[in-house]
Design a protein with these regions (language model features):
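Membrane-entry segments of alpha-helical transmembrane domains in multi-pass membrane proteins
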Residues: 55-56, 182
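Bacterial N-terminal signal peptides
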Residues: 25-35
């Protein structure tokens, strides 16, 4: 058992003489890849990795995939354990106290101003309501003048702006949790479910809904698919995002029914259009009032519905039960979790075995992850150093490797990940982020390179970009002096 990786230095890496580009390239290589020498685990095998083969490199791989990486000291600590002990410590994180502070609201979202507002309304709805009743958002339509709705427009813009600003603070708070949590799998799974049950703050314009959803996903991170699907079907942020407030008896809106079948549970080709229509009827009357789920029985369709060939007076919870009776659910969910934690390519044999295991355990997530993290396939050569990290994983894991205890103020985390293609709380659409190679293009590769350069060589970066200056020595020095320092 290796307690120390001989490829890692015993002291910090300092910049040496020579071409800075070469040094940076070497460090980038170290950051982007993992050593995989001496690892001969079997591909497509769910048999546990033998304790005799467990090593420092295996421990590093586990921490990287099940969390956001670790420092050499953390890796060595896990390498000194047995594989079972290491995996159990990560998976059974409830045994570790969550000592991180809750989100602290700034107060920019004025509860008093918006107390009597229908927060479901979009801009056009607000204008129509104002014209109809003469006031909205506590503001009265002006009786005369060219801009009769200006006060209402101002209130609407305040709602949008205050929610957006506060959500940026939530994203920063969440990034701090990813970096510092003693329960890294909890945050990794929260990130996974955020991409799976994609919801947009910019559409909902209410950061509180998104924060509440984030906390729900964290609470149920390794629970089971039945609990998760029901929770998200009743989640105010999700209901608002997919327009289920418009899904009422006699006028079913199919948005949520379509997405729960296509994107959240079964995948395309495993349901019919009639299944969507009938499932939509089952979800009628499910809406929210602010942060509260409402089951409006007056708007629920009590008629008989046929979903997946089974007929009954189904409601939303019944539909979730029917979904999980389909074999395709096991394949869809097992495959998505596998691709997130292991690698993009999965054999038919492995998918069938994982799906069967998930179904046999009633779609429980924790035992599924434990089996995955212990498996030889997880540590096999095709699984090592082949994952293209999302921008969030890329930044957080880099900070963890550098031993940072706080997310730096510069670059600003929400802005940096947004530039790299991943804005927490605002996936591109209900499908979430494509991931994999989609994270990389000429622009994002250059941005990743520059970001790493800025982190590793802040003084060099300050010389090139004075607005990120770390000292007056570099921000004020003439260009030739900065160049002379580089050459020394």
């Amino acid at each position: 058992m290796s307690e120390h990786d001989p490829t890692l230095p015993d002291r910090p890496i300092f910049r040496t003489q020579g071409a800075p580009g070469s040094t940076l390239s070497l460090l980038l290589l170290l950051l982007f890849s993992l050593a995989n020498t001496g690892m001969a685990a079997t591909v497509d095998s769910l048999e546990p990795l033998p304790a005799s083969e467990w090593s420092y490199d295996h421990a590093a791989h586990l921490l990287e995939r099940a969390g956001f990486g670790g420092t050499p000291e953390e890796i060595a600590r896990f390498a000194a354990m047995t594989p079972e002990a290491a995996v159990d410590l990560i998976v059974n994180y409830e045994q570790i106290a969550d000592t991180l502070p809750p989100f602290e609201h700034s107060g920019i979202w004025d509860e008093a101003m918006l107390a009597d507002v229908d927060l479901h309304l979009r801009f056009d709805d607000v204008m129509a309501k104002a014209a109809e009743v003469g006031e909205v958002y506590g503001e009265v339509v002006r009786e005369e003048g060219p801009r009769k709705l200006q006060d209402i427009t101002d209130a609407l813009y305040y709602k949008y702006l205050s929610s957006n600003r506060e959500w940026q603070r939530v994203a920063q708070w969440w990034a701090e949790r990813m970096l510092t949590s003693p329960r890294p799998l909890e945050e990794k799974m929260t990130l996974f479910w955020h991409g799976h049950f994609a919801t947009e703050e910019l559409k909902n314009d209410d950061y509180r809904l998104m924060l509440q959803q984030n906390m729900t996903l964290r609470q149920l991170a390794t629970s089971d698919m039945n609990s998760l699907l029901i929770a998200m079907s009743k989640d105010p942020a999700m209901l608002l995002y997919l327009d289920n407030r418009l899904n009422v008896k006699g006028h079913a809106n199919e948005n949520y029914a379509r997405e729960i079948l296509e994107l959240f549970s079964l995948g395309i080709g495993n349901y019919t259009e009639n299944d969507i229509k009938e499932a939509a009827r089952a979800f009628t009357g499910w809406r929210n009032q602010g942060l509260t789920f409402i089951d409006d029985r007056a708007q629920h369709d009590e008629g008989m519905k046929t979903v997946f060939g089974q007929t009954g007076n189904w409601d939303g919870e019944d539909v979730v039960d029917l979904i999980l009776q389909q074999e395709a659910a096991g394949e869809f969910i097992a495959g998505k979790i596998y691709r997130f934690f292991v690698r993009e390519e999965i054999s038919e044999q492995m998918l069938d075995e994982l799906a069967a295991r998930l179904r046999d355990d009633n779609y429980a997530i924790k035992p599924f992850l434990r089996a995955l993290f212990l498996s030889q396939d997880f540590y096999s050569e095709p699984s090592l150093g082949t994952q293209i990290k999302s921008p969030v994983q890329f930044l957080v894991s880099t900070y963890r490797k550098l031993g940072l205890e706080r997310i730096p103020g510069t670059p600003y985390f929400p802005a940096a990940t947004n530039l790299l293609g991943q804005a927490l709380g605002n996936p591109p659409n209900v499908k979430g982020w494509d991931g994999g190679r989609a994270w990389l293009n000429p622009s994002t590769i250059l941005l990743r390179n520059n970001l790493i350069g800025h982190l590793l060589f802040p003084e060099t970066a300050a010389g090139a970009y004075p607005r990120f200056a770390y000292s007056t020595r570099y921000s004020n020095a003439p260009a030739e002096a900065r160049q002379r320092d580089r050459d020394e």
